[in-house]
Amino acid sequence: MALRSRSWELLPVCRNPGCRVAAFSTSAKPVVKPEADPVGNEAVAPEFTNRNPRNLELLAVARKERGWGTVWPSREFWHRLRVIRSQHHIEALVEHRNGQVVVSASTREWAIKKHLYSTKSVVACESVGRVLAQRCLEAGINFMVYQPTPWEAASDSMKRLQIGMIEGGVVLQEPRRIYE
């Protein structure tokens, strides 16, 4: 009976938004959470640690490995678009400068293949370009380098893939690096 009367006394206390009652406490006094000091939040730390590895790339300050002048394709990029054409399929990859594949799209994927009449046609290239552009934007990649060979640049399918990427919102040229 004594416990029931205490619970009725705690009910109005628990309804206050700033008060909390400890669950295993036997006292009826509410626990008040102390206010945070707003002056401490304005202080700037003397040492800054960058925990986002892509931050320098987005600011156009990160280094681009230049490689040798005689190397083709050039190694001066943060992200590069590679297109691999096999006998039956088309695959487009976005490669980071360290060699890792960040995003890819291919006509081997069932989600893309089921909408296509042919996995090698010009329309397939444009579809792969649009899907890859959407995936790049979802991953936060807005700029990349595309360096086609002269015979690739002249083909209709590669032109349509570029058009699909550009219409999707990806810029196929990276900003210049800021050296200062």
UniProtKB/Swiss-Prot annotation:
Keywords: Chaperone, Mitochondrion, Ribonucleoprotein, Ribosomal protein, RNA-binding, Transit peptide, Transport
InterPro entries referenced in this protein's UniProt entry, alphabetically: Ribosomal_uL18_bac/euk, Ribosomal_uS11_sf
A Gene Ontology term for the protein's cellular component: mitochondrion
Subcellular location: Mitochondrion
GO MF: 5S rRNA binding; structural constituent of ribosome
UniProt-listed GO biological process terms: rRNA import into mitochondrion; translation
Listed SUPFAM superfamilies: Translational machinery components
Tree of life domain: Eukaryota
Major subcellular site: mitochondrion
Residues forming coiled coils: none
PANTHER family found in the cross-reference section: 39S RIBOSOMAL PROTEIN L18, MITOCHONDRIAL (PTHR12899), LARGE RIBOSOMAL SUBUNIT PROTEIN UL18M (PTHR12899:SF3)
Subunit composition and interactions: Component of the mitochondrial ribosome large subunit (39S) which comprises a 16S rRNA and about 50 distinct proteins.
Biological role: Together with thiosulfate sulfurtransferase (TST), acts as a mitochondrial import factor for the cytosolic 5S rRNA. The precursor form shows RNA chaperone activity; is able to fold the 5S rRNA into an import-competent conformation that is recognized by rhodanese (TST). Both the cytoplasmic and mitochondrial forms are able to bind to the helix IV-loop D in the gamma domain of the 5S rRNA.
Family: Belongs to the universal ribosomal protein uL18 family.
Name under which the protein is recorded: Large ribosomal subunit protein uL18m
Source organism per UniProt: Bos taurus (Bovine)
Lineage: Eukaryota, Metazoa, Chordata, Craniata, Vertebrata
Record gene name: MRPL18
